[in-house]
Amino acid sequence: AHMATEAIWGYGYGAQPGISVFSYNRISSGDFRKKSFVGADRSFDAIAPYTTLTEEEFATIAPYASFKFHAANGEKRNYSTGNVTSIPMMRVEEMYLIEAEATAHYDATTGKSLLQSFMANRDPAYTVPAANDLIDEIIFQKRIEFWGEGVIFYDLKRLNIGMHNGDTGTNAPPMAQLSTDGRAPWWNCVFPLNAVQQNKALAGKNNPNPTQTVKSVK
């Protein structure tokens, strides 16, 4: 329910998880995955074929809100029906993108070809941008493909990719308007205080040092 914008029940009601405006704007207009998100103009006509919400209900939806996840059988009011859904633990698309990235690290030409082949089923007019770093482009397409599925987190850590929620023009809420050079310090789980207090051998060995701070970008 927390990921389904249409769900009108429980704690998830009104949550409206959304995509970064920077990511949304980077998705090509011919990519069908862009239809998973509400545009800046909040056009109901654009999203109507893909939702069970009425135009009146849609009026409360914010720009860039996600419609990628839906309540089961389109049931937006009854949680006992709408919440019953399968959760894929692994998708074959991930394997294609892992192959493309791994190949690109040592053979850019073949890696580019693999990405091009993958994207042909998402945007037939897509071409790998010449100006973009190939690894960055592959990871971006992976971010869009698995948006909201929790897959990309470890890629961001592994490749030391930073956050840009504090950049000019952000649509992130005020408390989340933070930008980092490289991985964010809070992405590592630290030992809880109770564990450190009970086990003196952990003193000074937290992972990472939780005193690092990130300032909000105004």
What feature does the model see in each segment?
Residues 1-218:
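Acidic/polar-rich alpha-helix caps and helix-coil junctions
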